[in-house]
């Protein structure tokens, strides 16, 4: 059985919910929200002063409206919306995820995290056991861990199918098998292992839930089957914006009886996609092109060669992108700066690199605009703008940002200003009231 690691590479205690160490700058959700909002403002200011083309999006996400001009007149109120669009997105969702319309049903939910929250809090109760299979080097997303904890269920995470199978055999089948084929850190479970996990013998009450937020990467880059073609899946969610040209939304599909049950709570709590979002998702799923992702992956493979020549195995292929975990970014920076122990932690290091690449070169990565609890990893996704930049410019920008990280390893005031803005060292950071025990990391 895989136990949670209690400290990071530098001995800092890991928060078991988010899976990384909290720092003295990014202490929790409040500060991570400030960093995210600052990055959004930086993008806006750059576009206003230098134009939209001055920003190079390496986030792997689109998050535009996905709506055509001809559709806008039908979104002026719910009356024309119902006539033109109601019920037309769900068939695309079923097809996109490889589901069977005679057995499955779809819902469009406002976020992947909202889908995780509502599904898991509906299906689980105190005393239930959840076995989670996550990639080696990765983790189940906090937006799934939090609702499991909230209802009092027991969460056990495994990083190999052998360990999962051993626990299954010794302890019996759980209430829920939760599989994350690709983690937020862009680690990937081999297809054969996913299929093996889904084939484990189940009790009548055992359900299989796949948090397939990155399904588009699996299909486009890894050439794997769509979610419901993997095996006996009861419920699953994928993203409408991760390597898909749609708005931020969760495409939630599953057994018709379960989706009906969960759907009632979706409407109770106002988690359903709204009109414009609903239409944008339909367009994104209808026009989904795996070849675009494959081309991004080929560029990522070229970038990997360049970065591994500088950083060795610390740079790894994260599907159609290249990643360096925050702890490794700290080690690289320490080596260059010839400095000893730092008080910065991985999430701060990854954030500083991301904010520097944005400020200096207009390169927008997940680490700058990610929601709280996103994995502390430098992620360079080649979709959508990697080809516009080219490998050498991306590598040069990363190198400069790592040098900057090295210079601020022992300068907390400057590090804080990079992450939170010039007012941060004066104690003027924005305060967002979020209870840490219940805050949901949104995707």
Regions found by a protein language model. Name each.
Residues 79, 251-254, 338:
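Short, surface-exposed, charged loop/turn segments at secondary-structure junctions
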Residues 1-62, 308, 319, 415-443:
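N-terminal glycine-rich, Lys/His-bearing helix-loop that initiates the first secondary-structure elements
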Residues 26, 32-118, 142-147:
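Conserved N-terminal alpha-helix of the aminotransferase class I/II PLP-enzyme fold
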Residues 40-52, 70-76, 215-221, 234-239, ...:
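Short, mixed-charge, low-aromatic patches
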């Amino acid at each position: 059985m895989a136990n949670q690691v209690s400290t990071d590479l530098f001995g800092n205690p890991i928060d078991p919910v988010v899976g990384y160490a909290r720092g003295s700058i990014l202490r929790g959700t409040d500060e991570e929200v400030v960093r995210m909002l600052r990055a959004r403002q930086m993008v806006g200011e750059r576009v206003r002063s230098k134009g939209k083309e001055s920003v190079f999006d390496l986030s792997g996400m689109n998050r535009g409206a996905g709506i055509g001009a001809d559709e806008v007149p039908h979104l002026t109120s719910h009356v024309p919306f119902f006539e033109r669009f109601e019920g037309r997105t769900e068939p695309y969702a079923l097809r996109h995820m490889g589901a069977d319309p005679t057995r499955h049903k779809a819902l469009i939910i406002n976020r992947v995290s909202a889908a995780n929250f509502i599904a898991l809090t509906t299906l689980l109760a105190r005393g239930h056991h959840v076995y989670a299979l996550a990639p080696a080097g990765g983790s189940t997303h906090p937006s799934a861990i939090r609702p499991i904890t909230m209802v009092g269920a027991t969460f056990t995470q495994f990083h190999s199918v052998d360990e999962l199978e051993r626990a299954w055999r010794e302890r019996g089948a759980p209430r829920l098998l939760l599989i994350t084929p690709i983690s937020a850190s862009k680690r990937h479970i081999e297809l054969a292992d996913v299929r093996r996990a889904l084939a484990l013998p189940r009790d009548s009450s055992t359900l299989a839930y796949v948090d397939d937020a990155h399904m588009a990467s699996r299909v486009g880059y890894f050439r794997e089957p769509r979610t419901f073609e993997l095996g006996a899946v009861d419920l699953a969610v994928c993203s409408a914006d991760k390597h898909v040209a749609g708005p931020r939304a969760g495409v939630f599909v599953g057994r018709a009886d379960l989706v009906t049950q969960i759907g009632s709570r979706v409407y109770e709590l106002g988690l359903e996609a709204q009109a414009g979002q609903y239409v944008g998702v339909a367009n994104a799923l209808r026009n989904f092109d795996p070849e675009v992702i494959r081309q991004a992956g080929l560029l990522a493979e070229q970038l990997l060669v360049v970065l591994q020549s500088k950083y060795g195995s610390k740079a790894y292929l994260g599907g159609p992108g290249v990643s360096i975990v925050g702890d490794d970014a700290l080690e690289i920076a320490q080596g260059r700066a010839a400095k000893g122990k730092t008080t910065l932690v991985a999430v701060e290091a990854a954030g500083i690199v991301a904010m520097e690449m944005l400020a200096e070169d207009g390169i927008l990565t997940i680490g700058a605009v990610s929601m709280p609890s996103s994995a502390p990893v430098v992620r360079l996704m080649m979709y959508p703008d990697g080809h516009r930049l080219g490998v050498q410019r991306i590598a040069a920008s990363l190198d400069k940002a790592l040098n900057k990280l090295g210079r601020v390893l022992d300068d907390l005031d400057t590090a804080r200003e990079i992450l939170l803005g010039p007012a941060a060292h004066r104690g003027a950071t924005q305060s967002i009231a979020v209870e840490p025990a219940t805050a949901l990391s949104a995707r």
